[in-house]
């Protein structure tokens, strides 16, 4: 101790086993009885602690090293923490600067950083402005939403904030969009994301917003539907096309949601087994649909409901110059069981027949019977090797071309689910 300049220092080993500690900034607490050991040195000036250096600290589930500097009122003014580990955190380096106006600057780098504390209006963020700069292989943004990359932003005194995300955004640990630049806004109750990046190696636009009652919405747009659907692990048989995909989530677990998909001007390069099976009926032109560049479609629409592992295909339909089909049913990812029923019509063949059949106008007006040349099909069993059933009587049965071509032609023919057969 220098009595003239009133400065000095020392070291200490502290046993905190019986202590209770709460760090709301990291949503962490230690209860009495948990392990607590700290090796530290300290400097003081004018009878007040000026700096504490922690050589090693193991306190409950927290461990790390750090240097803490104090203001004249003994509040922390600056802190540098290294090798910090705690539930939700694996930080190589954390730097915190607290300015005279109580605004906070936070810089962190490491393998795992839980950023959800930034959205809590209690504790460290209450009535403070915060700016942050995080870089990590795993930035936890919300439940089941993480970012690999960099997050820079700020929060005002009311708890509302904005941020820029650069990197790969993941949903449930699966990449959603890569090499992305996304703008975000958030507070304690909601968040919105909007930006561009790569899905399946092609550029896509993504937007996300939380809605009322714990619901949220995800919208994806792309000029290359095929690559985007592959990147989202939805479908791998489509090539080209323009995509609009919308998910409306019913809860915060993202396991109960409605999906709407619309694809225009695309090809199916490997026809479903139901279409391939129709070739045995020797219908003119059908076999060519599964060869070469695939089947061309002008538009395809899918409405799918997800409840846990169940995928309920409410209506999946597509139409082009050569063929039109609609199907509905259900798939269970846990059991791999599939139950689908639908209709398929080779429109090029219908067009040829219309040209040679008398009284075409009467046929087109139709009746409530099975459509002319509309083939019913059903798939059931395991998705990897489904059992396919064809109703050949519908191929030659008299019926209604108008019904085949109408938007709701599947309503009377399909709409089954797995549990309807139990």
What function would you assign to each model-found segment?
Residues 80-82, 107-109, 341-343:
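A generic structural motif
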Residues 1-69, 115-345, 377-395, 400-422:
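Solvent-exposed beta-strand/coil patches in large extracellular/periplasmic or lumenal scaffold regions
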Residues 82, 92-93, 116, 156:
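Polar/charged alpha-helical tracts
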Residues 348-388:
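Surface-exposed, gly/pro-biased binding rims or lids
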Residues 79-81, 86-89:
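N-terminal accessory interaction module
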Residues 73-77:
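N-terminal accessory/assembly segment that mediates macromolecular interactions
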Residues 93-111, 160:
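Flexible beta-edge/linker motif
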């Amino acid at each position: 101790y220098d009595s003239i300049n009133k400065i000095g220092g020392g070291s200490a080993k502290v046993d905190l086993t019986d202590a209770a500690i709460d760090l709301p900034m990291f949503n962490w607490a230690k209860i009495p009885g948990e392990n607590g050991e700290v090796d530290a040195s300290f400097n003081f000036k004018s009878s007040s602690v000026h700096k504490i250096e922690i050589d090693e600290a193991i306190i409950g589930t927290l461990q790390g090293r750090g240097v803490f500097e104090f203001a004249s009122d003994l509040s922390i003014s600056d802190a540098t923490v290294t090798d910090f580990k705690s539930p939700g955190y694996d930080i190589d380096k954390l730097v915190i600067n607290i300015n005279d106006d109580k605004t906070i600057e936070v810089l962190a780098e490491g393998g795992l950083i839980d950023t959800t504390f930034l959205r809590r209006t209690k504790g460290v963020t209450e009535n403070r402005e915060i700016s942050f700069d995080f870089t990590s292989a795993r930035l936890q943004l919300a439940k089941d939403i993480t970012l690999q990359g960099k997050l820079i932003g700020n929060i005002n005194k009311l708890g509302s904030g904005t941020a820029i995300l650069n990197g790969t955004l993941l949903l449930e640990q699966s990449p959603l969009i890569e090499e992305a630049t996304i703008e975000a806004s958030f507070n304690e109750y909601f968040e919105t994301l909007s930006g561009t990046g790569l899905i399946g190696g092609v550029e896509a636009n993504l937007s996300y917003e939380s809605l009322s009652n714990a619901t949220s919405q995800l919208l994806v747009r792309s000029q290359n539907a095929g690559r985007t659907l592959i990147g989202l692990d939805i479908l791998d048989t489509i090539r080209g096309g323009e995509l609009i995909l919308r998910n409306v989530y019913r809860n915060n677990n993202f396991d109960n949601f409605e999906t709407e998909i619309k694809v225009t001007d695309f090809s199916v390069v490997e026809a479903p087994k139901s279409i391939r099976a129709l070739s045995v009926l020797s219908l003119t032109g059908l076999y060519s649909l599964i060869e070469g560049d695939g089947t061309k479609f002008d538009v395809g629409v899918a409405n799918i409901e997800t409840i846990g592992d169940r995928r309920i295909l409410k209506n999946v339909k597509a139409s082009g110059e050569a063929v039109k089909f609609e199907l509905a049913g259900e798939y269970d990812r846990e059991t791999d069981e599939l139950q689908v029923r639908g209709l398929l019509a080779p429109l090029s063949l219908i067009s040829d027949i219309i040209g040679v059949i008398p009284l075409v106008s009467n046929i087109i007006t139709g009746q409530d019977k099975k459509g002319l040349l509309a083939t019913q099909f059903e798939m059931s069993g395991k998705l990897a090797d489904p059992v396919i059933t064809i109703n050949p009587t519908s191929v030659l049965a008299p019926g209604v071309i108008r019904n085949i071509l109408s938007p709701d032609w599947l309503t009377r023919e399909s709409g089954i689910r797995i549990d309807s057969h139990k």
